[in-house]
């Protein structure tokens, strides 16, 4: 009887990139539907939507046009803080841990200290996105001043920044980016890594996370459980079948990338597909410190829904 | 003297022009082709000189991508999806523009409202409408249609209203003399009289509908299934398939040229040029 | 010749009572006509005669309902004149009074459909008939911008005539026509009036035309237009060549030419020749 | 009255040689005038007289350089007529020939500055003078849309006169003017011609005006306009009231009224009245 | 009869209107204020009814955010930055539009080129220009100016050219009669004669410059230091400071209203209304 009260349709939004591979696998292999049936629930009608940027995600979620949003962990924490007492968003699951890398085509730049006024660092979003926050964390560690590099940053989407960086004909000399752009840039030989986000955070950290409103999570606990189970299943499958996962990704995204290249990214030991959040509190602590959030969560469990608490998160 | 007059600036060409309209039309086509070839060559040359396919593919590479895109059927499907949204938004925009402009020409309050709304809302980017669009229409196509409507409504309304306001007094008096009802006065007098401006507004609205559609497709959410040409551009851009990105843009250009040639030029030739409202 | 005030008609079609028309406001206001009082019985044809810029067109527009009055009142059949309507069809002075997007036939037919509520076929038939009468059958399907000035005016005349209004407002309608065509148009006008009992308010600069067309002539003073004389045209004077005609013509001519327009005529100091 | 071909002038200002003007092409082509051959010596004033739609305005536009010829040649001082220029100032038939964004003074002054290359002050002085001569000093600073039809035409006349061109092209310039103003304008025209030796190509529908203004009258047949007669106006006929005047008037009248325009006149079957 | 005529539709109001222009102007202002108040109330009411400040803040909250934004100086600085870019792009767009339109009215080739370029480039979104813009102008302000120019150029050129083409024949002949040079003919005859359409184009160009600026600030590489009002909107949007987002939008609206009232209305009143080209 309770199952009938739960939602019959599930609207899930993702963004571009290989970071959303668990979603893509769940979609293509119809894992959510499968898990629902296994749990004895009617298979929900799943609608997969692509949106660009956390802001559009948030607005859609708050407007009730979406059930599950996804974005970088830092913007998610920010949204969690901002919506406390109103929309009350809450993490549903992490979408895996993978490093972001600051690359540069300027041979002189070996570390953050080597940037000069002539350098420009491209970031995919402004101020409060995932990469800008990590860059600020790194600047804080290096210079003791988190906004030291802000004046060098410009906002430019990943693909454009990559094209600019590789062209060598532009002011863009550095780019804080994510897979597969990291690997593409490094493989071209025209850029080298300057900084790895794992080093900044002190180890593997969640990159993207799925989140929803508390209201939805509380009204649909079984559906949420099914979703997490489906993501777990997707992660297990990816880990077990990296080659097939690469092929599936390429087919689903109509990607022109080389399957071996994608497979290499999936196999990268730094990349971990797991629903358990990693080092979420490192982000929240930093955000609290620089005043972007007003409440410092005591534990990652404050950020994520109860169904996840059994996982080994951090 | 014929020579002398032909040597005069085209803008000041005598009204006798219709004389050789038929031959002129052929001539025009020829010039257009020459210009198009020139632009294509320029593109090709510059892209080769640049030698950076990631930033700017050559024209030939773009055409190749275009042909492949159409051969695979994807580009055609995407274009169809976009056109469908576009037409819905365009249609809704035109209807609203017609209503607002009619209201504006019927009452002082309507006029003030139109002027106010145009001045206020026209400069707002599509992103400003997102919250309201999401609230009212949810994610996806209906919201897209909504922002396209916003993009079309104001240029068309503004141009039409400006056109209405510059209808000569004698023509207005002629219409009023027949005791026309307000809707008839608007539809049968003001609209044809302001047709040059309305057509300019329709052209602009069309262009802005495209611009907005492409820019909005991602912000407003699409699923791979329902994505249009904006989706095509974005996904290819995300994969650094620059030739495909430009193939998508070229498709927009081609659609623009076709619509211009068949629809707008045709409409102008069948109306304002035939009626002597345009030289 | 003094101002001959018209004896008030018992049941006038149109009555102007101290009509004053102004443009602009405040210090920059221009008075077009002042204090015009005249009645028009059914069947009357009043010709307005007066120097350029004395307010004839303005007065016609006011009667047509196109322009508000700033003083006095205009009554049509006892009721204040309201919005424009096809009961007062106007032929304007300007050449751009045809709808550019309709052919010659289309212009007249459209007016008949809308102004008289005729169906398309009936309107088309009547339109053809009238276009023939103004001698434009050849250009039935031509668009206005391909017509000569006089041809445009003739289409407007055909349109106004075809609607058979109670009151025709004609602002120098025949000014762009040659003598022969003009005479034919005058004949058509008189025949139409006879047939339908229409009244006419007619502006012209031709004294002979005034006598030929009008039952009364209202001569206006130079700007701002005031009533100078209201002269009935005796039946006898209507035939050109008669002495009555010659007398009336001479008297009107003296009236118009004699009193030089102090405002619009060049000050003598400024003139160098002739 | 047969076609009196003009004896070729030895050194004509303007010579038309078999001029034919057409609109449109192919089957839908309309011939406006056909085979016009006439010379104009310096100081000649040629009046075009002809029924509405016979191509008078078209011919004027062709001479002005606004319209290509489709047959024959037009020479000005021995050279093929080229682009329009201020040496051939035109007064068009339409009322919308003033620049709406310039005042009465501004319109005339601007024409003088551009057409004659005068500086602003000189142009302004001359403009004021001419505006005074057409009786419009009162509206010096008014914008064209606030003028009456006749007033607009007078501004255009003042503009054309002020430029003192070699050849004046005047298309029914006085049609919208009352008798007195019209006579004054005619006087101004004649005085100007006398003073500057200007030639004139003049379109009118008034026979008396033709005689008063012209040194020659070219009468055209109905559409398409062909030369019907080229009649010199004897000096003796120029004075109204003389028998020479009366004779010429009567002959022209017969010429124009007698031969009914088969094209533009209503076919007798179509006419019900008159 | 005055009453009867006043009861007639405003669109058909007699030309005698200037009669009470002075009193009318006051009247208009009054209506505008009423309408603005009505719109503000509507906003406030709907937002309260909705009760979702994260999505749509109330009007009063937005005004509070606006006041704070200006008090802190940030909003003013951001607006100034945006306006500077906007004016540069607008200016460049106008100059190019003038050149293209002049070219188009001088020669057949120019006309074909303008028509072709408008039909081709007008529908292209700003993103399409990104690669080329970055190539030519690099990151930041110059590229933004470039895309604003693109946004302004086409509507202004299209409107102006449509205006040029519908200048009545008699007016053209008058100009040619004076033997004007081509530039003079364009500047002193065609431009004032087409002013109603040109003004409509300028209004549209202004609006599209704003839209494009805001939309492009995110994609086109602005840094925190140099960001304008688009930056303000985006950063606040990313932080769900919705009241600030709407304060930014309200600023655009206010600027739009001021520019409309002072510039465009003023220009129209001083020109086309005074000259009787507009009722
Ligand atoms: N733009 C045009 N296109 C086609 N035909 C035209 C055009 N202008 C004039 N015509 C035709 O050419 C003929 C002559 O016209 P034009 O204006 O020269 O006559 P007109 O002698 O000046 O007449 P009016 O005395 O009525 O002014 C007419 O039959 C007219 O229909
Ligand atoms: N829209 C207007 N605004 C201001 N003044 C105007 C307007 N229309 C006409 N006038 C003025 O009113 C007066 C009368 O104009 P109107 O057109 O009625 O004269 P008219 O008798 O018809 O002259 P014409 O014989 O020259 O056509 C003129 O002095 C004119 O300047
Ligand atoms: Mg008049
Ligand atoms: Mg003519």
Language model features: what each stretch is:
Chain C
Residues 162-166:
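A short, proline-enriched helix->beta-strand linker immediately N-terminal to the Walker B motif
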Residues 120-139, 191:
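Conserved ABC ATPase "signature" region
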Residues 72-84:
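Conserved ABC transporter NBD signature motif
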Residues 143-147, 151:
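Conserved ABC ATPase signature
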Residues 64:
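Helix-to-loop junction immediately C-terminal to a conserved catalytic motif
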Residues 168-171:
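Catalytic Walker B motif of ABC-type/P-loop ATPase nucleotide-binding domains
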Residues 105-113, 124, 232:
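Short helical segment in ABC ATPase nucleotide-binding domains corresponding to the A-loop/adjacent helical element
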């Amino acid at each position: 009887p309770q199952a009938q009260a739960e939602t019959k349709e599930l609207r899930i939004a993702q963004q571009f990139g290989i970071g959303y591979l668990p979603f893509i696998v769940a979609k293509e292999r119809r894992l959510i539907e499968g898990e629902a049936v296994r749990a004895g629930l009617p298979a929900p009608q799943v609608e997969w939507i692509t949106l660009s940027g956390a802001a559009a995600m948030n607005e859609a979620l708050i407007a009730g046009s979406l059930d599950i949003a996804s974005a970088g962990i830092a913007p998610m924490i920010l949204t969690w803080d901002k919506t406390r007492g109103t929309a009350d968003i809450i993490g549903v699951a992490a979408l895996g841990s993978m490093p972001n890398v600051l690359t540069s085509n300027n041979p002189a730049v070996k570390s953050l200290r080597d940037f000069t006024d002539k350098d420009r660092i491209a970031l995919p979003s402004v101020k409060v996105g995932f990469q800008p926050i990590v860059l600020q964390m790194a600047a804080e560690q290096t210079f003791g001043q988190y906004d030291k590099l802000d004046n060098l940053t410009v906002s430019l989407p990943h693909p454009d920044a990559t094209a600019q960086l590789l062209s060598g004909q532009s002011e863009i000399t550095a780019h804080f980016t994510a897979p597969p752009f990291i690997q593409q840039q490094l493989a071209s030989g025209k850029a080298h890594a300057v900084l790895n986000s794992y080093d900044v955070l002190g180890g593997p950290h969640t990159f993207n996370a799925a989140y929803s409103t508390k209201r939805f999570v509380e009204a649909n606990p079984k559906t949420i459980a099914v979703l997490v189970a489906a993501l777990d299943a997707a992660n297990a499958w990816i880990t077990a079948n990296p080659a097939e996962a690469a092929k599936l990704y390429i087919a689903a995204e109509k990607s022109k990338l080389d399957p071996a290249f994608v497979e290499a990214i999936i196999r990268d030991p730094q990349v971990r597909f797991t629903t358990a959040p990693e080092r979420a509190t490192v982000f929240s602590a930093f955000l609290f410190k620089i005043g972007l959030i007003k409440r410092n969560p005591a534990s990652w469990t404050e950020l994520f829904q109860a169904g996840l608490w059994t996982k080994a998160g951090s | 003297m014929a020579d002398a007059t032909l040597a005069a600036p085209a803008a000041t060409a005598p009204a006798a022009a219709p004389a050789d309209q038929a031959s002129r039309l052929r001539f025009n086509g020829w010039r257009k082709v020459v210009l198009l070839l020139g632009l294509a060559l320029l593109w090709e040359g510059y892209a080769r000189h640049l030698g950076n396919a990631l930033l700017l593919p050559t024209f030939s590479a773009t055409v190749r991508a275009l042909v492949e895109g159409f051969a695979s059927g994807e580009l055609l499907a995407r274009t169809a999806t976009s056109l469908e949204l576009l037409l819905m938004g365009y249609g809704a925009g035109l209807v609203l523009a017609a209503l607002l402009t009619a209201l504006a020409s019927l009452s002082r309050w309507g006029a003030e409202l139109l002027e106010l709304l145009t001045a206020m809302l026209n400069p707002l980017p599509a992103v400003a409408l997102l919250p309201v669009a999401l609230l009212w229409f949810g994610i996806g196509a209906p919201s897209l249609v909504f922002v396209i409507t916003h993009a079309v409504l104001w240029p068309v309304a503004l141009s039409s209203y400006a056109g209405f306001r510059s209808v000569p007094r004698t023509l207005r008096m002629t219409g009023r003399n027949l005791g026309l009802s307000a809707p008839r006065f608007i539809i049968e007098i003001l609209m044809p009289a302001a047709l040059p401006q309305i057509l300019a507004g329709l052209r602009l609205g069309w262009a802005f509908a495209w611009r907005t559609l492409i820019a909005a497709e991602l912000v407003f959410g699409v699923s791979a299934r329902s994505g249009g040409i904006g989706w095509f551009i974005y996904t290819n851009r995300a994969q650094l398939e620059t030739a495909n990105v430009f193939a998508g843009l070229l498709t927009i250009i081609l659609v623009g040229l076709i619509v211009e040639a068949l629809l707008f030029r045709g409409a102008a030739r069948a109306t304002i040029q035939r009626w002597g409202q345009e030289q | 010749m003094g101002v001959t005030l018209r004896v008030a008609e018992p049941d006038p079609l149109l009555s102007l009572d101290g009509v004053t028309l102004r443009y602009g406001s405040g210090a920059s206001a221009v008075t077009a006509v002042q204090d015009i009082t005249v009645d028009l019985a059914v069947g009357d044809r009043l010709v307005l005669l007066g120097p350029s810029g004395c307010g004839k067109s303005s007065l016609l527009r006011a009667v047509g309902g196109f322009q508000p009055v700033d003083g006095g009142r205009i009554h049509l059949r006892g009721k204040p004149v309201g919005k424009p309507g096809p009961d007062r069809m106007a032929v304007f002075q300007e050449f751009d009074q045809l709808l550019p997007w309709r052919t010659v036939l289309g212009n007249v037919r459209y007016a008949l459909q809308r102004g008289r509520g005729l169906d398309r076929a009936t309107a088309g038939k009547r339109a053809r008939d009238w276009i023939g009468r103004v001698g434009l059958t050849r250009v039935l399907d031509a668009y206005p911008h391909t017509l000569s000035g006089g041809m445009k005016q003739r289409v407007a005349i055909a349109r106004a005539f075809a609607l058979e209004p109670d009151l025709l407002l004609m602002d120098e309608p025949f000014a762009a026509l040659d003598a022969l065509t003009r005479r034919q148009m005058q004949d058509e006008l008189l025949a139409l009036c006879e047939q339908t009992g229409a009244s006419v308010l007619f502006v012209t600069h031709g004294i002979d035309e005034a006598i030929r067309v009008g039952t009364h002539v209202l001569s206006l003073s130079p700007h701002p237009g005031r009533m100078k004389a209201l002269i009935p045209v005796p039946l006898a004077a209507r035939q050109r060549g008669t002495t009555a005609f010659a007398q009336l013509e001479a008297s009107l001519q003296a009236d118009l030419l004699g009193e030089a327009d102090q405002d619009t005529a060049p000050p003598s100091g400024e003139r160098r020749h002739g």
